[in-house]
Amino acid sequence: MSEEKKVVLTREYVINLRRTREVSRTKRAKYAVGLIRRFVARHLKVEPKAVKLGQALNEALWARSIEKPPRRVHVVVEKLDDGTVRVELKQ
């Protein structure tokens, strides 16, 4: 049986994705995903591999194709008791 993982910490961030404009156009959305992972890992003191992006956030990053991700995203970050971190798009 799988038991619910307990949320230890919840925070909201506005992540600026301005740096994606410094990367070639055909790599921007993928770079934005990595940028979000590194940002959250740095702020919550976990490894980037432990950061899981939600489906709505991923769809928002890729909505205008690979070349034009948004300039900034509003996210809700939840750290679970097993050390993983969930990142969801703020509604």
Curated annotation (Swiss-Prot):
InterPro entries per UniProt: Ribosomal_eL31, Ribosomal_eL31_CS, Ribosomal_eL31_dom_sf
CDD domains per UniProt: Ribosomal_L31e
GO BP annotation list: cytoplasmic translation
Record-linked PROSITE patterns: RIBOSOMAL_L31E
Annotated keywords: Ribonucleoprotein, Ribosomal protein
Domain of life, per lineage: Archaea
This protein's record includes keyword Ribonucleoprotein: yes
Coiled-coil regions, chain positions: none
Any one cellular-component term (Gene Ontology): cytosolic large ribosomal subunit
Membership in a protein family: Belongs to the eukaryotic ribosomal protein eL31 family.
Protein name, per record: Large ribosomal subunit protein eL31
Source species of the chain: Pyrobaculum calidifontis (strain DSM 21063 / JCM 11548 / VA1)
Gene name per UniProt: rpl31e
